[in-house]
Structures are given as structure tokens and as C-alpha cells.
Amino acid sequence: MNEQQRLASQQANASTKKEEKDYSKYFEHVYQPPSLKDAKKRGKEQVKIERDFGLPEEFRNFGKGRKFYIRTYGCQMNEHDTEVMAGIFTTLGYEPTFTTEDADVILLNTCAIRENAENKVFGELGHLKPLKQKNPDLLIGVCGCMSQEESVVNKIMQKHQHVDMVFGTHNIHRLPYILKDAMFSKATVVEVWSKEGDVIENLPKVRRGDIKAWVNIMYGCDKFCTYCIVPYTRGKERSRRPEDIIKEVRHLAANGYKEITLLGQNVNAYGKDFDDLEYGLGDLMDELRKIDIARIRFTTSHPRDFDDHLIEVLGKGGNLVEHIHLPVQSGSTDMLKIMARKYTREQYLELVRKIKKTIPNVVLTTDIIVGFPNETDEQFEETLSLYREVEFDSAFTFIYSPREGTPAAKMKDNIPMEVKKERLQRLNELVNEFSAKKNKKYEGQIVEVLVDGESKNNPDVLAGYTRTNKLVNFVAPKSVIGQLVKVKITEAKTWSLNGELVEEPIEVK
């Protein structure tokens, strides 16, 4: 234990019970709860790009001899944020651990998209309380999207006083300072920025594996769908400069990565916030496809921003894969209007027709919400009919979950839960039917598979994914992990494929 840690331990043990504190004043000055009116007024002039992340000398060996544990909930953006926080911890001298019992710092990187996700976090905080009682020096933190909600932070203050720090999505780069404050503070350290932070380049990362990598290309969302909390928790759209993205992808390719996924809450709005150049996702993809890396994906896209130039570029193929995740949410134009999706059923179908014409072998997947306020049986049937017409390969399906502060949360939630569950069951039956039918076509085909590693269910079986994001299980030597191989599909299941290795690793050119 170093001197800073020893002093922190003395202070923590001197008063294990945290002083009660009024946080309402804090929120009046720093945090504003979700406001559609205020959020739509936000400009882009405050966002700056910082390219030199560095740590002052005071943080050298700050975490030496200590371990960190991060549990991640939610989307790929949260997964990537966890990689950044792990990179910062490592730079501070901390070591990772895979058990909470062995950790000196525990962070829960949270998701606010649905109530169920929040309930899981509060449940986990309850489970961590005995650890804190056993070891008062343990630091417990809550970060991510839930932390951007005032009601959530107030609940943590009132019911989970063993939490040492709370910070949001805009100030991850300040983790060293937050850790230091938490180590020396008797009260919970709360640092939540209601306004977006700068775009910080060159943040350290500890990537999960060396085969696939996430690459953030933009942050935030300006679409303001009535049900969605993301524009409030993640802020306005801010795009990274193309030269920084291209540099990062080239670096990943040089280090042997085979696949990258470009990330953004609304990834195909990339570049719309630039005021000094006309440059969009299609232009970026056209540059990236020239880099020597096997596969490039992106997620998640909004139909409203899926333009013809992007479709044209994706049609060039090469390392641009034939899989597009295109959330529709509902097949009813009336429902889409209430959701503020800003497109109609026919406009979505026309977009699908354009994509299929340019990329005939494309695989489309989607997101769908059932039980949105005022959804009628007829409108739900329109969703089922759209699914059949598009012939999606799979879908993420959800029962509507009200999010405090969003316009939809003020609507009367007038669909009985039993009706919501019945609709979800019917939709999932259709999803399963089409997934099984689509996968059946792969039987007898030879496909390219990027091998991720051992199957989760059987260590003697390897698992990987096709260009169209199909899970393939097959028997092969462990030496092919991380490689591209040819596999003949012998059996199709609803959500996966079984096959046989027919060729040694493919050389990527």
C-alpha cells in the first residue's frame, strides 16, 4: 500500500458512515433533468477536440498494488467505454481482476435504455454492500448512462450510501481525479456533466481480445425519438475527425486485428455536425475500405440518415460486410409518427428495396418495440406484415419501457401487460420462423468464418462469425483462433450454424 492509499485508508476507517449531504443544490447548478425543449436548442460551438490525453506526475503509480473490476451493462458503446476506463486504470498502475471479491475498485458501467437494465444495477449494488462492510477501503462506483439521470443518482444517495463515486458519460477522461477524490472523501463523490464533454483523442484502451475491435466514430444523438433516453444521457451528436478515425483503424490493422466495428448511437449521422467540410459515413467507409483489414462493420444506423451514397459505397463490397442492422421499431406509420422516427412505413420499405438492389446478398436485422402507448391490434399486425415483407434474418424485440423525462413517458401507458406479452410472443415466433428459414439456406454452403475462440457451451468446439454475422460452431485445431477459415455448413439451427473445417486459414490481402 503506497502513502496515498495508507492515508486514504485512515480517513475511510475514521468514519465508515458517510455524512448525510443535500445533493439538490448540486443538481441545480450542474445537472438538468431531461428536457426536450432545452436539448433541441443545444448548439455545437462548445465541443472541442483534445488530442493529448495525459496524466500529471501526481498520478504515477497511483494504483500500484491495487486491482480494478468493471461490470458492463448495455450496448457496444458501453463496452467500448469500459475498454477506455480499463486503459486509464492500467495507465494508473492498477491491475485487472475478474472477481469483485479481489477488487480494490469496482465500477458498474450502466445502461438506461430500459427499466430492467436499471433494476439489475440496483440489485448488484445491494449485493456489493456486504463487500464494502467487510472492506471499508473498497471503492464502489456507478458510471454510464444511468448516472446521467437525477432520479437515479438521488436513489443511490438515499438507498446505497456505500457507493463512493458517481460519474456520467461525458467525463470518463476525468476518472483519475474522480478516483482520487473518492479515496480521500468521506461522502460520495458525484461528478455528472449535463453538457457534453469534448472529443478526447488518444485515450488509453485495453481492448477485449486482439481479433475484433470497436472504433468510436461519433458520440450522442439528435434524433429525439419520443421513447428514447439516449439523446439526454449521451448528449448531442459529435463526430470525430476522419483523419483520427483512419489513423486508429490503420493502427489496428497493423497490429493484426481482423475486424472493426464503427460505433455511434446514430452512426450514419456521422459528419453532419462538421461545419468546415462535407463528409459523411459513405465518404469515411470509402476511405476505410482501402485499408488492409478483413472486415468492417458499423452500428447502429437510423433509417432517416441512410443515404444513397452510403448504399453505393457499401455495394463495392471488399472488406465492407453484407450485414446491416436497420432498426425499424414499428411497421405502422401512425406509430412511427408518435415515436418521432421521422419516416413512414413506405419510406422504410423503399430504403430496403434500394439496399437489396445494390447489395443483393445483404442480411438485414432490426429492432422492434411492442406495446407502445396507444398501439392498436391493427398497428401491431402492420409490424408483423412489414417483418414478413422485408424478411429480416433476426431482430432484437422489446416490450416498451417508459423512461423518465422522455415525451413518451408522459403518454398514458394504456396497453395491458398481458397484451404486451402476447404481442411479444407472437412477434418472437415470427422472428424465430424467419431466422430458421434463412439459416436453412446455408446448409451445404462453404462460408468464410472469423474464428473468435472456443464455443461457450463446449471447449472442444470452436465458434466464429460469417461476414453476415451468423454464428458458426465447428471442430478445428485451436491454432485457427483469430484466423479466417472456410467452413462447410452441415446443420442449420434457429440461431446458429454447425459446420466442418474445409480449409486452413485464409491470407488477408
From Swiss-Prot:
UniProt keyword terms in alphabetical order: 4Fe-4S, Cytoplasm, Iron, Iron-sulfur, Metal-binding, S-adenosyl-L-methionine, Transferase, tRNA processing
Protein residues bound to [4Fe-4S] cluster 2: 221, 225, 228
Sequence ranges of Polar residues compositional bias: 1-15
Residue span, MTTase N-terminal domain: 66-184
Cofactor: [4Fe-4S] cluster
EC class of the enzyme, as a word: transferase
Transmembrane segments: none
Domain Radical SAM core residue range list: 207-437
Keyword Transmembrane helix on entry: no
Main location: cytoplasm
GO molecular function, one term: 4 iron, 4 sulfur cluster binding
Annotated [4Fe-4S] cluster 1 binding sites: 75, 111, 145
Gene Ontology CC annotations of this record: cytosol
Region span, Disordered: 1-22
Domain TRAM: 440-503
A Pfam cross-reference name: TRAM
Substrates-to-products reaction catalysed: N(6)-dimethylallyladenosine(37) in tRNA + (sulfur carrier)-SH + AH2 + 2 S-adenosyl-L-methionine = 2-methylsulfanyl-N(6)-dimethylallyladenosine(37) in tRNA + (sulfur carrier)-H + 5'-deoxyadenosine + L-methionine + A + S-adenosyl-L-homocysteine + 2 H(+)
Cysteine pairs bridged by disulfides in the record: none
Family, per entry: Belongs to the methylthiotransferase family. MiaB subfamily.
Quaternary structure annotation from Swiss-Prot or TrEMBL: Monomer.
Role according to the record: Catalyzes the methylthiolation of N6-(dimethylallyl)adenosine (i(6)A), leading to the formation of 2-methylthio-N6-(dimethylallyl)adenosine (ms(2)i(6)A) at position 37 in tRNAs that read codons beginning with uridine.
NCBIfam families recorded: miaB-methiolase (TIGR01574), MiaB/RimO family radical SAM methylthiotransferase (TIGR00089)
Name by which UniProt lists this protein: tRNA-2-methylthio-N(6)-dimethylallyladenosine synthase
Native source organism of the sequence: Bacillus cytotoxicus (strain DSM 22905 / CIP 110041 / 391-98 / NVH 391-98)
